[in-house]
Amino acid sequence: MTAKVSLEEKFRETGGKRPYVQRLFGRIARVYDPMNRLMSFGLDQRWRAFAARYLALSSDELGLDLGAGTADLSIAVIRNSGPGTRMIGMDITPEMLEVGRIKIARLGLEDRIDLQVGDAEHIDLPDNSVDGCCSAFTVRNLTDIRQGFREMLRVVRPGSRVVCLEISHPPGKMFGFLFYLYFYKLAPLFGTIIGKAFEEYNYLPNSLTTFPDAPTLKAIMEEVGWSDVRFYRLSGGIVAVHVGTKV
């Protein structure tokens, strides 16, 4: 049985991909941040800072962070934006948001970051209501990638950007081999030994099997209506930041 079939069977057992992902991240919420630091060798914070600089909201503007999780990207956007900038962070997993709220309170940012339970494919906001939208490691978990990008396009104001940070497929044989070795072999091992969560961290490589590479994701964004779409490969292409504008 292939990894893809196995993952699809897990989705069926839990009623679909969305409830599976919600349950999975709920179980690892308390170890999510330290495991991210460990598994990325600390690079995940640099990647988020890079993405945040491309969103870089002006003073008093409102941004939206989809799949906000523990709020690292929302915090990075606030740090890279003008005074009075505010963020709405949405995620389908309450346990992740609770970790994020503790972090936000510790930093004294409660009046600038509002975390809410919400679905990136059905955003509970009016059309043209935010000045920018971002996500980190969220698009891969969507049931329908195109629907997610359509919703992002709907809620941002004309002239605003979307910035998406995602694990990607690096070009070239050397980085491709290292990518395969790390994400398909070592990451589940780290998750098992340190996080005691084999299924959760085995989901990571399995979810990448059918996830589009950076040029294909760019084409999907253009297909649903985003303009001036470009992407930036980081760390040899193991992650990519996609940027698009609503005209």
Where are these regions (language model features)?
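A short acidic, Gly/Pro-enriched loop at the edge of an enzyme's catalytic core
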Residues: 121-132
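C-terminal alpha-helical "lid/dimerization" subdomain adjacent to the S-adenosyl-L-methionine
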Residues: 165, 169-220, 224, 230
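Short glycine-dipeptide loop
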Residues: 83-84, 156-161
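A short glycine-rich, Lys/Arg-flanked "PGG" loop and its adjoining helix->strand segment in the class I
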Residues: 146-158
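Core SAM-dependent methyltransferase catalytic element
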Residues: 227-247
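Conserved alpha-helix/loop element of class I SAM-dependent methyltransferases that forms part
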Residues: 34, 41-61, 76
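Hydrophobic beta-strand segment of the Class I
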Residues: 32, 133-134
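Class I SAM-dependent methyltransferase SAM/SAH-binding core
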Residues: 62-122
